[in-house]
């Protein structure tokens, strides 16, 4: 029998993935990974579960019950140190530099598809490694008739997770299986219910990857002390004080503390200036400064050929893909122009590129422009 190891989180998606693989005749083993320790990592303020049983341990109990139901062996591994160093400290450093990072993408790059794969390959030696992500892998032929894995969108467009996987290198996709890629979330739930899986009705995990739901300002204040500064309009009019520019993101509407200046149009963050610790706001969700037509993308990870310069881009999860024109600056940097202006393109976020349903690669949004002028987003 062909051996496959599944990353089993305790949630319904990975449970159904393991069930389907066993049904298909694979020799299935599972691994549960724990990557966060609230006490060790000073996760105090903003943590609603601090005085409860550790959520990760509850997830482990669910994973254990699922493995017993399915008759598969469950292993456990901790990547708490690796997550702290490779994911969380990069996350905090980005905020310190006035950027808005995506920890889920960092987590996939450094933990799920690097540390986890290295551990499983070394310790368990399977033919394949499977995950419960909503994505697909197809193989294309390039030079020397070799087959290369390409990341493709899931059938369920609402749950598609290729954006979060977009910065994976080609080698990280080798021998990976995504059993849920051709199923909808509703179908996954139905499979779990029909087969009496213990977590069939368990809620999906939300919040920061492997950390969970948090009061974001309070959570960040555990690691980044508040730095009070001015909130101004673009013409320099002072309105109020903010808690620290790193706590806000471009396009943000809520929690600005501008109720005394309310009118028919709500306020939005349109700029952040780190050197002066100034937060810029304007009224109306169609304010011109919220929009851009060009961006510089760095730290590119690309899979396959670079010949197509007319692609689609996604600059935040579940955003509709936008037509873009690419200009390569060097191997790791490109400039994109989008004929239709896009709202709240934010430095530090990931820009993922698509050729129809194939996710070609991604990079970090570095700078944002409109009609040749750089936006004051950093």
UniProtKB/Swiss-Prot annotation:
GO terms for molecular function: ATP binding; tRNA binding; tRNA-uridine 2-sulfurtransferase activity. It comes from the Bacteria. It catalyses: S-sulfanyl-L-cysteinyl-[protein] + uridine(34) in tRNA + AH2 + ATP = 2-thiouridine(34) in tRNA + L-cysteinyl-[protein] + A + AMP + diphosphate + H(+). The record marks 133, 349 as: Interaction with tRNA. The gene is mnmA. The keyword RNA-binding applies. One of its GO terms (biological process) is tRNA wobble position uridine thiolation. It is an enzyme of class 2 (transferase). Residues 159-161, 316-317 are annotated as: Interaction with tRNA. The active site is at residues 107, 209. HAMAP family: tRNA_thiouridyl_MnmA (MF_00144). InterPro entries: MnmA-like (IPR004506), MnmA-like_C (IPR046885), MnmA-like_central (IPR046884), MnmA-like_central_sf (IPR023382), Rossmann-like_a/b/a_fold (IPR014729). Keywords: ATP-binding, Cytoplasm, Disulfide bond, Nucleotide-binding, RNA-binding, Transferase, tRNA processing, tRNA-binding. ATP binds at residues 7-14, 33, 132. Belongs to the MnmA/TRMU family. The keyword RNA-binding applies. PANTHER family: MITOCHONDRIAL TRNA-SPECIFIC 2-THIOURIDYLASE 1 (PTHR11933:SF5), TRNA 5-METHYLAMINOMETHYL-2-THIOURIDYLATE -METHYLTRANSFERASE (PTHR11933). The lineage of its organism: Bacteria, Bacillati, Mycoplasmatota, Mollicutes, Acholeplasmatales. One of its GO terms (cellular component) is cytoplasm. It holds the Pfam family tRNA_Me_trans. This is tRNA-specific 2-thiouridylase MnmA. Disulfide bonds join 107-209. Its EC number is 2.8.1.13.
């Amino acid at each position: 029998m062909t051996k496959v190891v599944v990353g089993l989180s305790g949630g319904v998606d990975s449970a159904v993935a393991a069930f389907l693989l066993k049904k298909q005749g694979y020799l299935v083993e599972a691994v549960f990974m724990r990557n966060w320790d609230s006490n060790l990592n000073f996760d105090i303020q903003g943590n609603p579960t601090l005085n409860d049983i550790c959520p990760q341990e509850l997830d482990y109990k669910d994973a254990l019950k699922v493995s017993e139901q399915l008759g598969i062996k469950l292993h456990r591994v901790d990547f708490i140190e690796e997550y702290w160093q490779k994911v969380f400290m990069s996350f905090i450093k980005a905020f310190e530099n006035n950027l808005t990072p995506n920890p889920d993408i960092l987590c996939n790059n450094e933990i799920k598809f690097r540390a986890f794969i290295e551990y499983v390959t070394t310790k368990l030696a399977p033919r394949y490694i499977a995950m419960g992500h909503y994505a697909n892998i197809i193989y294309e032929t390039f030079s020397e008739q070799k087959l290369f894995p390409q990341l493709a969108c899931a059938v369920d467009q609402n749950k598609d997770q290729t954006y979060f996987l977009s910065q994976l290198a080609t080698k990280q996709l080798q021998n990976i299986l995504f059993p849920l890629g051709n199923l909808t979330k509703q179908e996954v739930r139905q499979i779990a219910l029909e087969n009496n899986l213990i977590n069939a009705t368990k809620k999906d995990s939300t919040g920061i990857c492997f950390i969970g739901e948090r009061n974001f300002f309070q959570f960040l204040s555990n690691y980044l002390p508040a730095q009070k500064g001015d909130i101004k309009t673009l013409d320099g009019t002072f309105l109020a004080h903010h808690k620290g520019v790193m706590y806000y993101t471009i396009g943000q509407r809520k929690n600005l503390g501008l109720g005394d200046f309310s009118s028919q149009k709500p306020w939005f963050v349109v700029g952040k200036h780190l050197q002066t610790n100034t937060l810029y706001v304007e009224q109306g969700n169609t304010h011109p400064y919220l929009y851009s037509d060009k961006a510089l993308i760095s730290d590119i990870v690309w899979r396959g050929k670079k010949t197509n310069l007319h692609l689609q881009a996604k600059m935040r999860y579940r955003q509709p893909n936008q037509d873009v024109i690419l200009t390569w600056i060097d191997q790791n940097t490109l400039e994109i122009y989008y004929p239709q202006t896009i709202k709240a393109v934010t430095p530090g976020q990931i820009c993922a590129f698509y050729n129809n349903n194939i996710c070609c690669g991604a990079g970090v949004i570095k700078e944002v422009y409109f009609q040749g002028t750089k936006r004051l987003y950093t």
